[in-house]
Regions:
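Phosphate-binding P-loop
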Residues: 1-6
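Hydrophobic anchor at the beta1->P-loop junction of P-loop NTPases
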Residues: 11
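The conserved Walker
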Residues: 15
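Conserved glycine(s) of the Walker
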Residues: 18
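Hydrophobic positions on the alpha1 helix immediately C-terminal to the Walker A/P-loop
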Residues: 22
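Conserved substrate/cofactor phosphate-moiety recognition/catalytic segment
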Residues: 28-69
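Glycine-rich phosphate-binding loop used to anchor ATP phosphates in small-molecule kinases
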Residues: 61-109
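Small-molecule kinase domains that catalyze NTP-dependent phosphoryl transfer to phosphate-bearing small molecules
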Residues: 122-186
Length: 198
């Protein structure tokens, strides 16, 4: 797909699907700055409350969460020059992506869970005190099973938004296993990029 000079490129998908990996490589490939919605300080501050799990039990918290996610996308759309904009928050405001390039990282749930557990183990190994809540234990342990349940809950909470985004016109579906091949077909209008290493 050709990119016009004014278009942002939105990269979204489930948590742990590979959005950040693809967005970073694509940013390098097409020479556009990367804007990660997860870096927003207000978003980071809400994370410990796990608002995505409280759609029914705390609707006010969930509504604040959704409003914040939508606001972050609105602000990103107004960036003065084209960017690669990456995050699950894009799923809350798909209409704001109209006229821009849309990419959905399409990764099977079992692969997302495996990735999430690996990421939790790496964070915990890096700093056990800071990341004690992310201890994923050893594979097959009760702790690992509990973290896998959490990953599944987050995925299931995003499923309606993922399905709605997937059905939008012009959405490019990029399977995680195909990143390298897909990136090799992305042209660079501002210079040459190397893509993602195999």
């Amino acid at each position: 797909m050709q990119r016009s000079a004014e278009q942002h490129i939105f990269v979204t998908g489930a948590c742990g699907a590979g959005k950040s990996t693809l967005a970073k490589a694509l940013s390098h490939q097409v020479q556009l700055p990367l804007h990660r919605l997860d870096d927003d300080p207000d978003f980071r501050q809400m994370l410990p409350e796990e608002p995505w799990l409280h759609r029914v039990t705390d609707p006010q918290l969930y509504a604040r969460w959704q409003a914040l996610r939508r606001q972050m996308v609105q602000e990103a759309v107004r960036l003065p020059q084209p960017h690669i904009i990456e995050g699950t928050h894009i799923l809350t405001a798909p209409e704001l992506t109209t006229g821009h390039r849309r990419i959905l990282v399409d990764t099977p749930l079992h692969q997302i869970i495996r990735q999430w557990l690996a990421r939790d183990r790496a964070k915990y190994a890096e700093d056990p005190l800071r990341y004690s809540a992310r201890d994923a234990g050893v594979p097959g342990s009760a702790v690992a099973r509990q973290r896998a349940v959490c990953a599944r809950q987050i995925y299931e909470s995003l499923r309606p938004e993922l399905d709605a985004f997937r059905s939008l016109p012009g959405v490019e579906m990029v399977p995680r296993r195909a990143f390298t091949t897909w990136l090799s077909h992305q042209g660079s209008e501002r210079g040459s990029g190397s893509g993602l290493a195999s």
